C-alpha cells in the first residue's frame, strides 16, 4: 500500500492497505495488511485499515483515547494496537501477535517463525508506531515486530534524546531504519519493512511535512514459497 503522509490538516493520508496475494489452483489468498491511521485530533482524520493484520490506531492531541485500530483476519494476522491517552499511538498487528498499545509500548506485533526455506526466519511483523514523547519511545517500545517490521520514527530532540531501536533482523532481509533524531518536529519518517518479509512499515512523525518528510515507512514485499 501507499505510504501515509500529512501535507496539512485538510489533506491527510493514512497508510494504504497492502495488496492481496493468491494461488489460483487451491484457492489460497493471503490478505494484505491494513495501513496505519493519521492523527485524528484535527480536521479530516483517516482511520487505520483492516486486513490480514490491522493497522495501528492514531494518538490524540487531547488527553483522551484515540481512534479505532484496524482488525486482523483470523488465521492470517492480528489486530493493530490501541492508542494511548496523549499522543501515543498503537503499533501494527503482526502475523503472530497484536500490535503494542500506545499506553505502554506501541511496538509492532511479532510475526511467525517458519523454516520452509531450510533456514528459520520470522515473517510478517507489524510496523512500530511513532510517539511524541521520549518516555514512550526508548529501547524496544517502538520497535518493529519480528519478521521485518519497520521501527517507528523518533520524536524531535526538543522533548529529549531517544535510543532508536535497531532494525529488525529476524526476517529473510533486514528492515529499514527510521530517520535519525533531529530538532525538527515534523521531519522523521518510519523505517520500511524488510523486502520479501511481508513486514509493515513504521509510523512517521505525528505532524507530517508534505510528501517527503514525516512519512510512514514502506511495507515490505511478500514472498511465495511452495514446498513439495
Where do the PLM segments sit?
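Low-complexity, glycine/proline-biased repetitive segments and flexible coils/loops
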Residues: 1-228
Amino acid at each position: 500500500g501507499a505510504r501515509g503522509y500529512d501535507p496539512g490538516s485538510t489533506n491527510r493520508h493514512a497508510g494504504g492497505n497492502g495488496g492481496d496475494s493468491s494461488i489460483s489452483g487451491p484457492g489460497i489468498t493471503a490478505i494484505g495488511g491494513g495501513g496505519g491511521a493519521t492523527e485524528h485530533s484535527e480536521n479530516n482524520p483517516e482511520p487505520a485499515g483492516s486486513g490480514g493484520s490491522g493497522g495501528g490506531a492514531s494518538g490524540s492531541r487531547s488527553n483522551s483515547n484515540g481512534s479505532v485500530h484496524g482488525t486482523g483476519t483470523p488465521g492470517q494476522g492480528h489486530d493493530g494496537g490501541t492508542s494511548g491517552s496523549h499522543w501515543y499511538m498503537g503499533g501494527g498487528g503482526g502475523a503472530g501477535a497484536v500490535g503494542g498499545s500506545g499506553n505502554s509500548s506501541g511496538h509492532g506485533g511479532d510475526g511467525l517463525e517458519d523454516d520452509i526455506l531450510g533456514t528459520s526466519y520470522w515473517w510478517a511483523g507489524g510496523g512500530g508506531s511513532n510517539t511524541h514523547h521520549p518516555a514512550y519511545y526508548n529501547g524496544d517500545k517502538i520497535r518493529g515486530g519480528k519478521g521485518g517490521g519497520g521501527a517507528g520514527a523518533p520524536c524531535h530532540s526538543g522533548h529529549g534524546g531517544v535510543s532508536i531501536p535497531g532494525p529488525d533482523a529476524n526476517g529473510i532481509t533486514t528492515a529499514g531504519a527510521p530517520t535519525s533524531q533531529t530538532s525538527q518536529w515534523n521531519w522523521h519518517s518510519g523505517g520500511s519493512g524488510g523486502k520479501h518479509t511481508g513486514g509493515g512499515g513504521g509510523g512517521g512523525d505525528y505532524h507530517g511535512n508534505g510528501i517527503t518528510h514525516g512519512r510512514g515507512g514502506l511495507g515490505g514485499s511478500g514472498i511465495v514459497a511452495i514446498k513439495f
